[in-house]
Amino acid sequence: MASTSASGTMAVKYGTMKTVISGLTVVLPNGDIINTGGRTKKTSAGYNLTNLFIGSEGTLGIITEVHLRLSPIPESIMSAVCHFPTLEDAVQTAQQVIQYGVPIARIEMLNKDQMGISINYSKLKDIQAVPTLFFEFHGSESSNNENIKIVEELSKDNRGSSFKWAKDLEERNKLWKARWDVYYSVKALINNGRVYSTDVCVPISKITECVNFAEEQAKKFGVRAPMVGHMGDGNFHVVLPFDPENKESYKKIRAFNDTLIRKALELNGTITGEHGVGLH
């Protein structure tokens, strides 16, 4: 995870690997072992070697040890699902939640196609195959309630449904199952199929434009485009199923990804938000 500068669904609140790692032990190509960073809150001692090695994908050295910053376990954790009539409504809501400065722990998006795939694969009930946002709030009960009011109001303004809530761990896991099963549900669409995932990341102010562009281009290229997004940090994945024996299908997917990458760069984004570039 450190080598690719990975992150997860809670990066919007707790940060990426660059945020949570305070120091590394690294073996350099010549065999030397170095330690970067430390346990202090701050330092002005030269170059930030820790951040240089994070995301370098093994090209500068092999990371053998990491020092992590820990966060306290929140007093209260609350999860919710909200459905929307269009993908644009859902993405716009997420964009506004971040722009309002709501300290949300997770805000994940699944488009209509992905919701349908997940529901069928995981035999889920009480959720709909429509564009959906998954929210999670961490904090004290009172602060969570205040933040929930804001998010519910923003969702309502964008034609969102009433929230479906989960408080205890078992309920939360059921609620999030559609999200956790994304990869396997898409892989199961094709016998012996594979999955190609895009990983562009754009500024929050451009996330609606980029997601809309991805949907338009998927239609243009004739590819099926289930979608999942970490809306809190502008990162989303088009999760494309393909048959490895079908060369033409794979070419189409690569061409679609190239087009999406160019759009992300045009919007001052990046080609990869968390997966890395796959250096060998």
Q: Where are the predicted features?
A:
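Short conserved micro-motifs on helix faces and helix-strand junctions that flank
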Residues: 5, 55, 200, 272-273
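General alpha-helical segment detector with a strong preference for membrane-spanning helices
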Residues: 62, 69, 207, 278-279
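C-terminal substrate-recognition/cap domain of FAD-linked oxidoreductases
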Residues: 72, 81-86, 91-259, 263, ...
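FAD-binding subdomain of flavoenzyme oxidoreductases
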Residues: 1-108
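Short beta-alpha connecting loops at secondary-structure transitions
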Residues: 245, 279-280
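Short acidic/histidine-rich active-site segments
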Residues: 230, 270-279
